[in-house]
Amino acid sequence: MFFANIEKHSNFTYYILFFKFCKIRGELVTYKEKLLEKYPDLIYEITWTKEKDDSFLQITLNENNLEKITEYSKEISNILDNYEKELPSKYFLDISSRGINLSIQKENLDNYLEKYIEISLVNETKKIKGILWEIKNETIILKVNFKGQFRKIEYKKNNINLIEEVIK
């Protein structure tokens, strides 16, 4: 008898009652719920901001690969198109990476073999970029590009002040 009394009310009341009924049964899902359901580990944050007369839906992802972020942006935009009644008529969609901690601990260097890194040496201001080629007990070997020629250079771990991952 849930729907028996609805016919006596306006369309708006019908919509509200139907919405509450479906929500209780778990049939209606908000855009946030849908996005978090589809991308539980990917979405870091969903926020609305307003600047002057413009509304921005900002979605921050746990992803650093630009190509993947572009793919996810298209997918998320398509999902949001199905929720246009729930969203403002005009808004800007801003999807970005939350970034990463680029600092690498010496104990974790094994995870960065054959990856592009940058090191800072103790008592030197110049940073050296290269591919982490080999890891030994007390040293690392970087494959460094010197004017178009690659050279493998060995650095003592205790002479390295900071190691950072380089995103190309």
Curated annotation (Swiss-Prot):
Chief localisation class: cytoplasm
Keywords: Cytoplasm, Ribosome biogenesis
Protein species of origin: Mycoplasma mobile (strain ATCC 43663 / 163K / NCTC 11711) (Mesomycoplasma mobile)
Coiled-coil portions: none
Subcellular location: Cytoplasm
Function description: Required for maturation of 30S ribosomal subunits.
Full protein name: Ribosome maturation factor RimP
Entry-linked InterPro entries: Ribosome_maturation_RimP, RimP_C_sf, RimP_N, RimP_N_sf
Name of encoding gene: rimP
Span of the signal peptide: none
Family of the protein in this entry: Belongs to the RimP family.
A GO cellular-component term linked to this record: cytoplasm
Superkingdom to which the source organism belongs: Bacteria
GO biological process: ribosomal small subunit biogenesis
